[in-house]
Amino acid sequence: RITSVLRLLETEEGRDRTETIRRKLALLRDIRSTIERTGGNCVFDDIELFELKFFALLAEELRPLASQGRLAELPELNGVVDLLDPEGNRLPHFFVYGAYSEELTTLRKQIKARKQAGADESQVQELYFRSVEIEDCIRERLSVELRKYHKALQQALDLMGWLDVVIAKAMQARDWGLTRPAITQDTASFR
C-alpha cells in the first residue's frame, strides 16, 4: 500500500487527496475503549455518544477519499450518523435531540414557558426530572442500537489508524528518497 500512496503523491490531484486525508486523520482521537464498549451491555453518556458521532462523521468523510485513491475500503457508518443525528445536521456535537421523543420536546417547551412565566420552582423541577428520565431512556435505547455497529466501528478505527501510518511511511520514503529493495540474481547496486 505504500507504493499506492507513493503513486498518488506523483500527481497534484493525488497530493491534494492525500493531504486532505492527512488533515482529516489528524482529527482522529483514540476512542478504542468507547468502541469496545459498543460490544457490551453498557449505557453511553453524552460524551461517549459525541465521540462515536464525531468518529462516524469523520469516517464517512474519509471513506470516499480513501476508496477513490484505492487506499482502503472503510465500512459504511451512515447508520451510526443517522442514529446519533436524527435531525440530519451532520454537525460534530451530540445532544439528546427533541427529535428522539415528542414527549421530551413538549416537556422542554413547558419548562421554558414556566420559567419565563415565573412559575414555582418545584413545578419546574418536577418537569425537569421527568425530562431527565426520558433522556436517560433515550441514551439507553441508543446504546442498545449502537451494538449492531460494533464490528464496523472497530474495523473503521483499525483501518483509519493503518491508513495514517501508511501515508506517513510513504511521505517519509518520498521525502528521504528511499527506494524499495529488490532481490536480483546478477549484481547488487546501491543508490
Which residues are covered by each model-predicted region?
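Conserved amphipathic alpha-helical "coupling/scaffold" segments
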Residues: 1-107
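Charged/polar positions within long, soluble alpha-helices
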Residues: 7, 11, 33-40, 61-68, ...
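Charged, alpha-helix-enriched surfaces in structured cytosolic catalytic cores
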Residues: 19-26, 47-50, 54-57, 99, ...
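Generic preference for flexible, low-structure residues
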Residues: 47, 65-68, 147, 169, ...
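Extended, charged alpha-helical coiled-coil/arm scaffolds that mediate oligomerization and mechanical coupling
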Residues: 76-164
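Conserved NTPase motor "head" modules and their coupling/switch loops across ABC/AAA+ ATPases, GTPases
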Residues: 158-191
